[in-house]
């Protein structure tokens, strides 16, 4: 989604005044004035959400639904379209995906109440209950269960301070971090917000930083640090914010802007988020958008999850676990102690195989407590969410008790903290609530509380009595049907119900006379094939049934509200338990993956070493295994930023298709996995943490920004040379290939020298400029490795093995031949190459080549009569005599030619 096109509705739209409008249209226009100008208004009318005026025009086009007219206003026809309320979420999902925002105007009373309040012409009261935006979704039908849905706010103060605050409304997660200007793109790419709030003056810049996010510009006043601090204190009911962190002014501004926007989206209700967690600057490995895309961490270049690194290692069994794993890959750590804590948790589950399998079986039953809790807190939850919470916390307690029974060893920090969050023995109120939810809610409750029928029998005596009265009345209806049928002698008589007539007697048209003459039956409706009647008894019975049903439903809704309030009181403990379950899922799943893929625990340090023995590319290895194309060839990689244990800059040469790019990417992914706190696909690994990861591998035109492929490549290279530090890790592939040979070689040469002397970082530099390999002789911390190939019976065989030293050939012409270049072109290329290699000076050699000397196409080979006859012979079908005759015949043919 392009950011500049994510405002499909202008922010300066205007609508007609309500003067002269009908009462209903007057109400619509009043609500329309309250809603954000850049949002569509879904106006509830019975079983439909209707849209009017410009909203209808835009929505009908986006949803491909009919656009009609509904009367006139101020002399102009009123455009209208609508969607059924029962399927509204599907339409909402399409609008949100297209970048729209939608204000929802709900009916706040039923028509009966409206009539009782203001007579037959009274308009049902309506109010905007929420504004649905890409970053404020909570419904399962609108979200991918395995993907976080974040909304972020970027605050940039005039002092130069900047900060990002972000939240996932669907889980309650809320964080903030200071951010340096040069890291903005990397930070935004890491969180991948569905929606980004920015100050109006920074909209254009933000559009470049977050091309896939919906941008929401806000007035400067929304980013005021002082008012934000007051808002934060009120929101979390504290006197000082130091309990949550020592926030900078920029952090306060970002937090406040985000809270204010979320409150507006809830029609003024406060956001239901956990207290903000502060993330220190530099706490995560910085990965810029280009690097993130080229390494295909969470999505491939085509946008698919399949084929990404996340897809290759994900063995999680819960949606919260999948989201947490994706977050870890998106934001690897730089703190060795925190990385080791994650690795300790994986190691613990790696050793406890039986317990791990039992845990994973239990987790499959746990559901998504994080999102269920958030929906309940926001007033969007239902009975199923209550049941889901109870099930998750019950499973959590069982998991905790079983893991605590382990006698293998003491659990590491992350595991012990999770066990503490799941054990209910020291949380009596939460334990009591879970037990109450289990008793109160039926096994398969409805989605919405208003549907009723979710409170279990025996939980509330008065509710049971009302249900019995309601059900008994329904049995009386069945008895009345039989009585009426016998009284009038019409066995086909039926008692039915609809929302217009209530209960009524229905007979076919030919039996109508039998009831018309009976005073008990009051004629109500004649249809083509049936006649309908009512009776005094049915009317009285319906009133009793309706009264009992209404009272029972009201009692259930009250019970739901009470249980929801109790859940809200325990929200912090429930969140802690839900996070623990997700933590266990990630650790156990990574242990499972490590076992399946023979991954090793990396040894982490603060130095600058990068020693990999038998490293493999996790995605390519998995693809080979699935396709049955053999085993991946492992390779070592040794780098040292200090240049002591190994070279810090290594040139990688070798034939096309030999695996240079794969080798580069696999080492970048190994570093990233290690810093994410995962085992790595290698026999052994010793890794010093990096502060930034850069990948200049592959490029494409960026026509929207007026950039050619070469320009895009140079911009990425410039960013690396300007920003990489001695602690960074860089992979570069074919720098300078998009321009003239000498220009490209010169650029690549200068970039290599700069990486070595100025940046001083660990770097892998793949190139076909063999002249570059001479730098290893001149630069003290530069070296050469190459991908090996062998010629066998005229064919080139790629070994995919990395060895020391530089390659002497690229075999590009051989690869071109394999790709299907015409033979004449291949031969011409071979001739040109031979001349160039012999003369050693490309410009001079080319001028000496006879133009088009070999460009005349060779004649197609003529197949002789002998060859044709030989092709027709089946030697196994010939007798010795027949074979001899054929031989004489072939010899005779040769004499003719």
Curated annotation (Swiss-Prot):
**SUPFAM superfamilies in the record, alphabetically?**
DNA repair protein MutS, domain I, DNA repair protein MutS, domain II, DNA repair protein MutS, domain III, P-loop containing nucleoside triphosphate hydrolases
Q: Which residues bind ATP?
A: 654-661
One GO cellular component term: cytosol
Per its UniProt record, what InterPro entries does this chain match?
Answer: DNA_mismatch_repair_MutS (IPR005748), DNA_mismatch_repair_MutS-lik_N (IPR007695), DNA_mismatch_repair_MutS/MSH (IPR017261), DNA_mismatch_repair_MutS_C (IPR000432), DNA_mismatch_repair_MutS_clamp (IPR007861), DNA_mismatch_repair_MutS_core (IPR007696), DNA_mismatch_repair_MutS_N (IPR016151), DNA_mismatch_repair_MutS_sf (IPR036187)
Keyword Magnesium recorded: no
Q: Listed disulfide bonds for this chain?
A: none
A GO BP term here is: mismatch repair
The record's GO molecular-function terms, alphabetically, read: ATP binding; ATP-dependent DNA damage sensor activity; damaged DNA binding; mismatched DNA binding
- Keyword vocabulary terms for this entry: ATP-binding, DNA damage, DNA repair, DNA-binding, Nucleotide-binding
- Cross-referenced HAMAP family: MutS
Question: What protein family is recorded?
Answer: Belongs to the DNA mismatch repair MutS family.
Record's function text: This protein is involved in the repair of mismatches in DNA. It is possible that it carries out the mismatch recognition step. This protein has a weak ATPase activity.
Tell me which NCBIfam families the record gives. mutS1, PRK05399.1
The name of this protein is DNA mismatch repair protein MutS
Give the gene that encodes this protein. mutS
